[in-house]
Amino acid sequence: MVIWNPWHGCHKISAGCANCYVYRRDESIGKDASIVTKTGDYNLPVKKNRQGEYKLTAQDGMVFTCMTSDFFLDAADEWRQGCWDIIRERTDLEFYIITKRIDRFEQCIPDDWGDGWNNVTICSTCENQERTDYRLPIFLKLPIKHREVICEPMLGEINMEKYLASGLIEHVSCGGESGDNARPCDLRWIQEVRRECIRCGIPFTFRQTGAVFIKDGRTYHLDRKLHISQAKKSGYSYVPGMGTANAIKYKLPERQALFERLQRSDFRNRFHLSDKDRNYIAEKGIDVIRSHAHDLILKRLSAENPENDGKQTPMKGHPVFIAQHATACCCRSCLEKWHHIPSGKVLTKDEQAYIVDVLME
């Protein structure tokens, strides 16, 4: 990995900027991060050694660009064309550009940009729902070959599935905020975006917990050295088809506590077996109904990413359908929220048996 900062300094424009790490670091050494200056590394990707060879090679990895500023900052307009010239010259390098200013993209690209350059990935940040709904519609309409989204610092629950469903976003990452004044990040927010990525078949990375992390309603204050390691340890990063979710450790809910919680749900309490349902069960026999439940779980819920998950009603009118909704076993999202079984993994035989037992109780 290479960091290329052709200029330094930035201007805060949204909620995600409030506790900017660049401002924190500059303030600690007596600098003003709002003053934007060209750096000595401006020509870094095209610098050569004494043999006339580029110092940076493709083996050095992705070139993360403008990590102490924003590539599309208006204060850097006079320097940007030179950077495009460098990126054009170094087609053997991959450049990664993160921005909060995706709305300035079209006025900042070079004349020969076309439908995008293969060696450039543009990553739009989305720290909350308001910025997501503003930036992503713009992002998806732009001529870009490689798009990614990063929710960091993640400041609230975000729903972006309608944007992910476009098929234009290649990767999503989320993470909490660092620093002494860090705002909290809730694991539930991370899990929801992760589930949306799974349903859309998009790789997801949980980058860091942040300094203030909420899990199961409990708030944890974490040392900086633990932010990344704890996120990695959680196992919540996801790569389709790679079995990554198998690393997630979880504990099934205690059965009595589960049913007490279900009884407190107005939605779950809407589902009751009718006399017709009970007669059907008596006619078929409990073993047949159990086999129906087992077949349903195996065929409709056991896959890593079930087709039409949460939208299918294959046994509507069947007692098992009623039980599915009453016990929150209707989709993989509910299985995670209510039963702690992670999304994005193939259900084991033990997990399938547990779900059948819950349905039949």
Task: Locate the predicted segments by residue.
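Conserved Radical SAM active-site core
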Residues: M1-V120, Q129-T132, I158-I169
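Active-site beta-loop-alpha junctions enriched in small/polar residues
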Residues: T68-D70, K100-I102, T125-Q129, E152-M154, ...
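The feature represents the first ordered module of a protein
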Residues: F259-Q312
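Auxiliary Fe-S-binding modules of radical SAM enzymes
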Residues: M1-H8, E161-N246
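Short, compact, well-ordered microdomains
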Residues: C83-I87, T91-Y96, R104, F206, ...
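Histidine/lysine/aspartate-rich catalytic loop segments that bind and position anionic ligands
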Residues: S124-T132, P137-A165, I169-E170, G176
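Immediate flanking context of iron-sulfur cluster ligation sites
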Residues: M1-S14, N308-T327
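Conserved, mostly hydrophobic/aromatic
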Residues: C17, T65, I97, F139, ...
